[in-house]
UniProtKB/Swiss-Prot annotation:
Cofactor binding notes: Binds 2 magnesium or manganese ions per subunit.
Composition bias, Polar residues: 104-115
Stored SMART domains: VRR_NUC
Keyword terms of this UniProt record: Coiled coil, Hydrolase, Magnesium, Manganese, Metal-binding, Nuclease
Organism: Dictyostelium discoideum (Social amoeba)
Segments for region (Disordered): 1-79, 104-154, 169-202, 459-486, 816-835, 842-871
The protein's name in its UniProt record: Fanconi-associated nuclease 1 homolog
């Protein structure tokens, strides 16, 4: 462990506890998880011997040796201590906890200070229990209460016995700090016997109160640490284990709080003065003592002028402080913080007027302004990042923010059991031993047969024995090498307790992810291409070592270095293609094709290799590559195969080749084509890049939004309400109209009624009609809202004259739709606010006159909330929305624009219990997973083959009622984070109708495609799903055959758009099943 005062190496054991060190939060004793169980608050010690008294002089010498003068308590890592101003008594039970104390002493540092036992004299002998059995019963009762009320009850508790226990069996939980001791100066002796007679003993209630006071982020942090430490303890070295055990067992609560706070902040450096004046003091009693504790145990380190660079802490300064340091340079005040940091870094730059470096001057100024600062030790940060990676199995998550969000927002995850290393039963062990014996017998028999055959070969073919032996030796060597390669890179999850079998594999993966993050930052920031090429060269070297290796579990390959290097090289191909370095891309692609990683990208790699050869005018080579990919690659997806077949047909045109080899073309000439429909609509040009084209509807679409309003009800009679309402409305409404007219004229906007706007839109350009339609909607809302707001203002300014139900809109009530194009940002809201101010000032005098007259009649008002509906007309939409309007008016179809999302949702819901089956090993490594680790891989189907096949058969023979049963069971998990499920987009009623229209057979057919090849069929489905319920009696129609409803799949294409390869595959699959599929072409009416 690192220390700031001495130049010492890292300790291989927990650091010693300073006997002269005082911590105000400890309140007289070292608090750790061991003390939580060892210090019995209900059991007195055994017969004490002789008390040792200290004089006042000795107490003064003790005070001088302490670093903090808050109390006079000495600290020992084991013994209980109770102290007053004149006497210090330390005692512990020798007979009850002898074995446990010896084990804890072995785990501590040999250099830790040993304080002799100071046992009290005969004053405490009367408090000894009568029998030892009562003492053991009291201990058991106390530990049961603690176990029930502990928030981090993750592991098994320590049993109260006298037998020897291992260190790993201790309960790893958060320590608690005892309350302050109430010492007096008049007493001369104290006893550590019963709680009633001792003021320093911490009761169970006090400990439970301290546990409840712990923040949720600290609990989450400890849960993550404890879970990973127990499950993956083999991945940590001794120094890292010391850090983890010190965090869980040795540090007090305040130190833990401070460390977690600093770890979750952006650092790395923090000013101590800022920490002491922050809000942390509300939850941490003594921040200074917590910092000293963390520094002593090696978690934090102080800034040192000799050890660290002052530029690391310069970022803590504010912009005004940086300007004062760099005041000697003529730098514009408008410059950013980075400019001033670059200036005070001391590096020479253009415009520097001195030959000598001002670095020492800047260094002194920065250090004086920053003051004392601390940071978390780099090794500690990397350790806990690794712990969080192993807990969440997400290398983009470095802290417990997802757990914090889960606690705050109430986000739920599916119910499953996280995989743990299970102890094999005796029956399983015997069966495995029998199988091993059988395998050994078979291997021995095979060896004997081979030896006999070799003898026969030697006698018959003596002349060619040398050559045959050499060949056999070579073959055996090759087989041995292959076996070694498989063992080296194969991840056998049936034997290992973790996906990472050893520490070396974990560290390699961590370094590879850091390299990937660095390369992405270089690419996004437009960094040096030379640095990026150096990273790619490392990837090439490392990936070349694992090209010929084989693996069993493809989902576990995600956590290997080869997978990461493959991804880096894959996305870098696009960069070099833009730079027209086609040969370099081909070299990368040839290596990627030979690797076993990222099989879903193989089709993309083959296509890019063919295209790059075309760029280099190597058509013959491109043709050979296309043929090789179709012949030899069994991992080609259907859409990728269709694209390569198109390249093959193009390259095989005469005179290069007159005939394509048989068996290579599987899709190009066999795909079924859908029916084509063309509709014409007037296009609205928005002249904005990156936005879809919009087309006018035949009839405006009506959209209803709900607005929350507060109603202030007066206690006056209805007659008075009607009188005041008529007087106010007649005066205010005329002013509203005049004010809106002036505002609109100044903004060059014309007021039109909806009828006038529709009649005039025919004589306007599309963009003018779009503006007018938007403004009509805005003005209609604005005028109504202005009237309500004026009534609100008059009632607030003149509360005693209010006599009607006044509607108060929320400030954000204008933003009532997700369609931003309907409301130009801030325009209508600004008009409304100006109207409110002007009209309020104009009627203020009348309100003051009415205030005096109605002051005596005004009663107390009551507030209520109501929801009102607001109707908005939408005049234009996307090609999909226009198509939905067309099929609604022509055939009465109902439908949604969903593409593949609705079918993935149905697939997950109908297979929920199979997907989240905890019996599949190693697929659930964290409680924060929205899907198993193998979801979407080849192993997902093979490991659950029987269950999936049975569910598909059940769906094929299901009627509507059977589908509803499965759907309702899965809907009980509504709100859980599940991959592919959006609970808010569709309701249970909508899913039920869609399931009824689709039928069990079609749902089973689509589910089989998603199960067997999720990566290919999880995209590319037609845009629209249409359904229509026929007006027939359900009694006369068999729901099982789905004759009472009709469905239609529609792929929508705009001008210049065409079907993609995977879309053509989906269309062919649906038509082959018997579905009605169409392609709707939306074209501009003018053209």
């Amino acid at each position: 462990m690192k220390s700031n005062t001495k130049n010492s190496v890292k300790r291989k054991s927990p650091p010693p506890v300073n006997p002269n060190k005082k911590f105000p939060s400890f309140e007289g004793k070292q608090t750790s998880i061991k003390d939580f169980f060892f210090n019995d608050t209900t059991t007195p010690p055994k017969t004490p011997t002789q008390p040792i008294r200290f004089t006042q002089n000795n107490n003064k010498e003790n005070d001088k040796s302490n670093n903090n003068n808050n109390n006079n308590n000495t600290i020992t890592p084991i013994k209980k201590t109770t102290t007053t101003t004149t006497v210090v008594v330390e005692s512990f039970d020798d007979s009850r906890n002898t074995n446990l104390i010896q084990q804890f002493q072995k785990a501590s540092t040999p250099s830790s200070p040993q304080i002799p036992n100071k046992l009290p004299q005969q004053e405490n002998q009367q408090q000894i229990p009568n029998t030892q059995q009562q003492q053991i019963k009291q201990l058991q009762q106390q530990q049961q209460q603690q176990q029930q009320e502990s928030p981090n009850n993750l592991f098994k508790t320590i049993k109260t016995t006298t037998t020897t226990e291992t260190f790993e069996e201790f309960l790893l939980s958060q320590p608690t700090t005892p309350p302050p001791s109430n010492t007096t100066t008049t007493t001369t002796t104290t006893s550590s016997s019963s709680p009633s007679s001792s003021n320093n003993i911490t009761t169970i209630d006090d400990k439970n109160n301290l546990i409840k006071n712990n923040r949720y982020y600290l609990n989450d942090f400890l849960i993550v640490t404890e879970t990973v430490y127990k499950r993956d303890k083999h991945l940590f070295i001794n120094d890292e284990k010391d850090y983890i055990e010190g965090m869980i067992e040795t540090l007090d609560r305040d130190s833990q709080h401070l460390f977690v706070r600093l770890y979750n902040r952006k650092g790395p450096w923090f000013q101590i003065n800022e920490l002491k004046s922050s809000n942390y003091q509300n939850e941490i009693k003594n921040i200074g003592a917590a910092i000293e504790s963390l520094v002593e145990y090696g978690f934090l380190e102080y800034y040192s002028s000799d050890k660290h660079d002052y530029n690391e802490i310069a970022n803590l300064l504010k912009i005004d402080q940086l300007k004062s340091i760099a005041s000697s340079f003529s730098i514009p005040n408008s410059s950013g913080k980075e400019t001033f940091l670059k200036v005070i870094s001391g590096e020479p730059f253009k415009g520097q007027s001195t030959l000598f470096s001002p670095k020492p001057i800047y260094k002194k100024k920065v250090e004086n302004l920053v003051g004392e600062s601390i940071k978390i030790v780099t090794e500690v940060v990397e350790l806990w990042r690794m712990i969080h990676h192993l807990y969440f199995y997400s290398w983009s998550t470095h802290d417990s923010k997802s757990m914090i969000v889960n606690n705050i927002m109430g986000i739920k995850y599916p119910e499953y059991t996280v995989w743990k290393s299970k102890v094999k039963k005796e029956v399983q062990q015997k069966e495995e031993e029998v199988e091993k014996e059988k395998e050994e017998i078979l291997q021995n028999q095979l060896i004997q047969v081979k030896q006999e055959s070799d003898v026969i070969d030697l006698t018959q073919n003596s002349s060619g024995s040398s050559n045959n032996n050499n060949n056999n030796n070579n073959n055996n060597n090759n087989n041995n090498n292959n076996n070694n390669n498989i063992k080296e890179y194969d991840i056998d999850l049936t034997e290992n307790e973790s996906i990472f079998p050893n520490r070396e594999s974990l560290l390699k993966y961590e370094n590879a992810r850091k390299l990937e993050e660095k390369s992405i930052n270089l690419y996004e920031s437009g960094g040096d291409l030379v640095a990026l090429e150096s990273i790619l060269q490392v990837c090439l070297d490392e990936l070349g070592r694992s090209v010929s290796k084989k693996v069993k579990y493809s989902f576990a390959l995600k956590f290997t270095v080869g997978w990461v290097y493959t991804r880096i090289l894959s996305w870098s191909i696009d960069i070099f293609e833009k730079l027209r370095k086609y040969q370099q891309c081909i070299d990368f692609l040839m290596l990627l094709i030979e690797s076993p990683y990222c099989r879903g990208k193989r089709g993309y790699w083959w296509q890019r290799m063919i295209i790059n050869h075309k760029h280099l005018h190597r058509s013959d080579d491109a043709l050979l590559i296309a043929e090789r990919s179709l012949k030899e690659d069994p991992f080609l997806r259907s859409g990728d195969r269709l694209a390569i077949e198109k390249h093959l047909i193009q390259l095989s045109s005469p005179p290069r080749r007159w005939r394509i080899p048989a068996g290579l073309i599987q899709f190009s000439y066999k795909l079924k084509e859908p029916i084509s429909t063309t509709i014409y609509r007037e296009k609205v040009s928005n002249n904005q890049q990156g936005y879809k084209s919009k087309y006018l509807f035949l009839t405006p679409q009506i959209k209803i939004n709900k607005i929350k309003k507060i109603i202030i009800k007066s206690s006056q009679s209805q007659n008075n309400q009607q009188k005041v309402q008529s007087s106010l409305s007649s005066q205010i409404q005329t002013q509203i109209q005049t004010q809106i007219q002036t505002q609109i004229q100044s903004s060059q906007i014309q007021i039109q009624s909806p009828i006038q706007s529709q009649s005039q839109s025919q004589n306007q350009t599309p963009i003018q009609s779009q503006i007018n339609n938007n403004n009509n909607n805005i003005l209609a809302i604005s005028s109504q809202k202005s009237f309500d707001s004026i009534l609100t203002t008059t009632s607030i300014n003149n509360t005693q004259s209010s006599s009607q139900n006044i509607y108060i809109d929320e400030e954000t009530s204008l933003e009532i739709t997700s369609d931003d194009e309907l409301f130009p940002p801030g325009q209508s809201y600004k008009i409304e606010k100006e109207n409110q101010l002007q009209i309020t000032n104009s009627v203020k005098k009348e309100e003051e006159q009415e205030e005096e007259e109605e002051e005596e009649e005004e009663g107390q008002g009551q507030e209520e909330e109501e929801e009102e509906e607001e109707i908005i007309e939408i005049t234009h939409g996307t090609v999909e929305e226009v198509s939905l309007e067309h099929y609604s008016q022509n055939g009465g179809w109902e439908g949604i624009h969903c593409e593949t999302s609705i079918f993935i949702t149905l697939y997950v819901l109908y297979f929920w219990d199979i997907i989240f089956d905890s019996n599949v090993p190693h697929v659930f490594q964290s409680p924060f997973q929205n899907s198993p680790l193998d979801f979407g891989s080849d192993e997902f189907y093979f490991t659950r083959k029987e269950a999936i096949d049975n569910r598909i058969k059940r769906l094929e023979h299901s009627n509507y009622d059977d589908l509803l049963i499965l759907l309702n069971q899965s809907w009980l998990h509504n709100g859980c984070e599940a991959r592919g499920v959006n609970w808010k987009s569709t309701s249970l009623e909508q899913l039920s109708i869609i399931s009824k229209c689709l039928g069990g057979k079609l749902i089973a057919f689509i589910s089989r495609l998603l199960t067997e090849d999720f990566k290919s069929f999880s995209h590319g489905m037609p845009d629209l799903l249409l359904w229509k319920l026929n007006n027939n009696n359900d009694d006369d129609i068999d729901d099982k055959n789905n004759n009472n409803s009709s469905i239609k799949f529609v792929e929508v294409k705009g001008t210049g758009d065409r079907l993609r390869d995977q879309q053509r595959i989906w269309i062919d699959m649906l038509i082959s099943f018997g579905c009605d599929v169409e392609v709707c072409l939306v074209k501009n009416k003018k053209n």
